[in-house]
C-alpha cells in the first residue's frame, strides 16, 4: 500500500468495524422493540421496526464499502486483505476478493440479509403494522445472529500489526474468474431470501392466523429468492464446467448439494403457497416447508464454514466457527418447530378437495420434491455422521444420487404436466382424459421424430425427449384452454405475468432435462499425447495441435496451446487452452479452450508437458451441454417474471386487514 493511500485510509478498517457494531445495535433494536410492541399493542414501538431496518442496512453498506476500499487500496495491514489479495491482482478480482473467503463472504451475507430486510420494510407498507413489526423483528433476530458471528469470530477488519507484509498472498487462483464475481452474490440472494419466507411464516404463527392473505404476501418474496438461488446454482455449474478443467458440470459435491436442497424445498414451497393462497389448504405443510427451506440454507452455511468437509467450494475455517453456526441452526430449527407445535391446532385447514384436482397434483409435486431433497440430505450427511461416530471414511458418489434422483425427476415432470391441466377442487375424469390424450400422442410422436433426427434411439434419450415434449405440449394445451373464449390472439395478452412465468419456468426444466441427458449419454472424450503438428479425431471433428507458447500474465505465467478444429475439410474454430502458474501461491491451474455452440461444445484442456513440445491433451465433444444452463436461466427468469404479477400489488391491503386484523393479536 502506498504511503499516500495508507495515510488517507488509515482508519477506514476501524470505521468499517465500528459500522458492523452499529449495525448489530440496530439489529438488536429491530429484534426486540417491535416484537414487544406487537405484544403490548404499542404502535410507537412497532413503528421502530422500519427505521431500525434502514439503519442496519445503511451501516452494513458502509462496512462493505470500507472493506472494498481496503482491497482496492492494497491495505495489507488488514489480515483478510493480505490473505486474499496482491498488488498485481487485476482490480476486478480485487473487488470479487472482497467476498472470496470466509470473513468477507459472511459480510456479504449480512449485507444481503440487510438488503432483503430493507426491501421488506419498504415494499410491505400495506401490511398491517402488527404483521410487519413481527416480520421485521424475526429478520432482525437472524441478522443479530449473523452479525454476532461476524464480529466475534470472523472480523474482516482485523489488523496485522506491527509487521505489515510488503505484499499479499493473492486470491485463490480458482476464484480468479469472471464467474465468481456473480455466482456467490446470486447464491446468497437465494440463501438469504428464504429468511423472508421464514419470517412471514413465524410472524403468522405468532399471530395465530395463516390464510390466503399471508400466502399472497409470502409468495412473491419466496419466488424471487428461489429464482436467484436457481440462477446462482446454474452459474456455479457453468463455472465448474469451464474453470476446473474436467469437462463436468455437476459432481454431487456436498456443497453443491447444500445449495440444491433448499432450492428443491423452495420449489415445493412456492407451489404450496399457491394452494394456500387459492384454496386455503396445506397451511401447516406450507409453514413446515418455509422453516425447512431456511433451515437448509443455514445447514449449507454450516457445511461450508465448519471445516467438516473438503470441497472446492468450502472455506478453510476454524471448527469453532462451525459450532457457533450449529448452535444458531439448532436455535432456529428448535425454536420454530416448538412454536409450530404450539400453534398447529389453530392453523388446520378445513377445506376439502377431490382426488383429481390441482390440489392433489401439487401435493404430489411437493412430496416428490421433499423426497428428492431428503435423499440428497441423507447422501450428504451420512458420511459425516459415520465419520464422527466411528471414524470410518465413506464416500457417497454419483451412482447413489443418480440412481435415486433421476427417476424422481422423471416422475416430477409427469406430475408437472398433468398439474397444469387439472382444475382446482375437482376435475371431471372424462374432460381430463380428453385434455391429456392429444398431449400424450403428440409427445410420443415428437419423441420418435426427435430420435430419428438426432440419430440415437437410446432409451434414456427417447424417454427424455418424450418427457420434455410432454411438459411443452401440456403448457401449449393449457394456453389454448385459457384463451378458448376470447380466441388465441385476443386471449394471449390477458394472461398474467404469473401465468407466463410458470410456463417459462416449466419450459426451463424441460430444456435443462434435455441438456442433462443428451450431454451425459452422448459425450465423447479422449486423452492422449499430442506433439506439434499431430492431430486426432473425435466425433467427426479433427483437432490439430500446433504447439504451446509461453507468455506472462499480470500475476501468472502461462503456456497457451493452439489447436485448430477441422470438420469436413473446413476449419471451424481455433482453441487456446492454457496451463497457468500463479506465481505468488505457486499454484497451477487449467484454463480450457471451448468452442461453444447451440447444439455442441468442443472442449480442450492441456494436461502436463511431456517433453519435445508434446503435451497431454484432453478433448471432449459435448452435445447440447449449453441447454443445461439455458434451461436453468429460463427457470430463474420465469420465477422473476411471476413475482412481478400485478395481483401481488393491488387490492391486497383490504384482504390482509381482513385476514390478519390491525390490532389485538398477541405476539
Regions found by a protein language model. Give the residues of each.
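Short, aromatic-rich amphipathic segments at membrane interfaces
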Residues: 96-97, 172-177, 599-631
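A conserved hydrophobic secondary-structure block that centers on an alpha-helix together
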Residues: 21-35, 39-42, 105-237, 245
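Hydrophobic alpha-helical membrane-insertion segments
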Residues: 56-71, 139-152, 289-297, 366-377, ...
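Soluble non-transmembrane domains of integral membrane proteins
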Residues: 526-618
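Membrane-interfacial loop-to-helix junctions in multi-pass inner-membrane proteins
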Residues: 39-60, 119-143, 206-227, 252, ...
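Membrane-interface helix-loop-helix modules in multi-pass inner-membrane proteins
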Residues: 61-136, 151-171, 233-277, 300-323, ...
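Contiguous transmembrane helix-bundle modules in multi-pass membrane proteins
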Residues: 3-44, 62, 76, 254-262, ...
Amino acid at each position: 500500500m502506498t504511503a499516500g493511500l495508507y495515510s488517507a485510509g488509515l482508519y477506514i478498517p476501524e470505521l468499517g468495524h465500528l459500522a458492523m457494531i452499529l449495525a448489530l445495535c440496530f439489529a438488536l433494536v429491530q429484534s426486540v422493540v417491535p416484537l414487544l410492541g406487537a405484544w403490548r399493542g404499542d404502535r410507537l414501538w412497532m413503528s421502530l421496526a422500519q427505521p431500525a431496518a434502514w439503519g442496519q442496512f445503511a451501516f452494513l453498506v458502509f462496512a462493505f464499502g470500507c472493506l472494498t476500499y481496503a482491497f482496492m487500496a492494497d491495505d495489507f495491514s488488514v489480515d483478510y486483505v493480505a490473505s486474499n489479495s496482491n498488488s498485481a491482482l487485476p482490480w476486478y478480482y480485487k473487488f470479487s476478493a472482497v467476498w472470496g473467503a470466509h470473513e468477507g463472504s459472511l459480510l456479504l451475507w449480512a449485507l444481503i440479509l440487510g438488503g432483503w430486510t430493507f426491501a421488506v420494510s419498504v415494499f410491505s407498507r400495506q401490511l398491517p403494522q402488527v404483521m410487519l413489526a413481527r416480520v421485521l423483528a424475526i429478520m432482525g433476530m437472524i441478522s443479530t445472529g449473523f452479525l454476532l458471528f461476524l464480529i466475534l469470530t470472523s472480523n474482516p477488519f482485523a489488523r496485522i500489526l506491527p509487521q505489515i507484509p510488503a505484499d499479499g498472498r493473492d486470491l485463490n487462483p480458482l476464484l480468479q474468474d469472471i464467474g465468481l464475481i456473480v455466482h456467490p452474490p446470486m447464491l446468497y440472494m437465494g440463501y438469504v431470501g428464504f429468511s423472508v419466507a421464514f419470517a412471514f411464516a413465524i410472524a403468522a404463527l405468532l399471530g395465530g392466523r395463516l390464510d390466503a392473505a399471508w400466502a399472497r404476501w409470502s409468495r412473491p418474496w419466496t419466488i424471487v429468492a428461489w429464482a436467484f438461488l436457481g440462477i446462482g446454482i446454474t452459474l456455479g455449474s457453468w463455472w465448474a464446467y469451464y474453470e476446473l478443467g474436467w469437462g463436468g458440470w455437476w459432481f454431487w459435491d456436498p456443497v453443491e448439494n447444500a445449495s440444491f436442497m433448499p432450492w428443491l424445498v423452495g420449489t415445493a414451497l412456492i407451489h404450496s403457497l399457491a394452494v394456500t393462497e387459492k384454496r386455503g389448504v396445506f397451511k401447516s405443510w406450507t409453514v413446515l416447508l418455509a422453516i425447512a427451506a431456511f433451515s437448509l440454507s443455514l445447514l449449507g452455511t454450516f457445511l461450508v464454514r465448519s471445516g467438516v468437509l473438503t470441497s472446492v467450494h468450502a472455506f478453510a475455517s476454524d471448527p469453532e466457527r462451525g459450532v457457533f453456526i450449529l448452535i444458531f441452526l439448532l436455535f432456529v430449527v428448535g425454536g420454530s418447530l416448538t412454536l409450530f407445535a404450539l400453534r398447529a391446532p389453530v392453523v388446520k385447514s378445513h377445506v376439502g378437495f377431490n382426488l383429481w384436482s390441482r390440489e392433489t397434483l401439487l401435493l404430489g409435486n411437493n412430496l416428490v420434491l421433499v423426497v428428492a431433497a431428503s435423499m440428497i440430505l441423507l447422501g450428504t450427511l451420512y458420511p459425516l455422521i459415520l465419520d464422527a461416530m466411528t471414524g470410518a471414511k465413506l464416500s457417497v458418489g454419483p451412482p447413489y444420487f443418480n440412481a435415486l434422483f433421476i427417476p424422481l425427476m422423471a416422475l416430477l415432470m409427469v406430475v408437472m404436466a398433468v398439474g397444469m391441466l387439472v382444475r382446482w377442487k375437482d376435475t371431471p375424469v372424462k374432460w381430463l382424459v380428453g385434455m391429456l390424450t392429444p398431449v400424450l400422442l403428440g409427445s410420443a410422436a415428437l419423441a420418435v421424430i426427435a430420435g430419428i433426427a438426432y440419430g440415437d434411439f437410446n432409451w434414456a434419450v427417447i424417454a427424455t425427449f418424450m418427457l420434455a415434449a410432454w411438459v411443452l405440449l401440456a403448457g401449449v394445451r393449457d394456453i389454448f384452454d385459457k384463451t378458448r373464449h376470447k380466441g388465441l390472439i385476443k386471449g394471449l395478452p390477458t394472461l398474467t405475468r404469473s401465468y407466463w412465468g410458470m410456463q417459462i419456468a416449466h419450459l426451463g426444466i424441460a430444456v435443462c432435462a434435455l441438456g442433462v441427458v443428451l450431454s451425459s449419454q452422448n459425450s465423447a472424450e479422449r486423452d492422449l499425447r499430442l506433439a506439434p503438428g499431430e492431430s486426432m479425431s473425435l466425433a467427426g471433428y479433427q483437432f490439430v495441435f500446433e504447439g504451446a507458447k509461453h507468455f506472462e500474465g499480470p500475476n501468472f505465467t502461462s503456456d497457451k496451446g493452439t489447436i485448430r478444429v477441422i470438420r469436413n475439410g473446413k476449419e471451424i474454430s481455433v482453441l487456446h487452452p492454457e496451463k497457468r502458474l500463479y506465481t505468488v501461491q505457486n499454484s497451477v491451474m487449467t484454463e480450457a479452450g471451448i468452442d461453444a455452440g447451440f447444439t455442441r461444445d468442443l472442449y480442450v484442456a492441456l494436461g502436463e508437458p511431456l517433453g519435445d513440445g508434446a503435451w497431454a491433451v484432453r478433448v471432449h465433444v459435448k452435445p447440447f451441454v449449453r441447454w443445461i444452463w439455458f434451461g436453468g436461466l429460463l427457470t430463474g427468469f420465469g420465477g422473476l417474471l411471476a413475482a412481478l404479477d400485478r395481483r401481488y400489488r393491488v387490492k391486497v391491503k383490504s384482504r390482509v386487514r381482513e385476514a390478519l386484523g390491525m390490532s389485538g393479536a398477541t405476539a
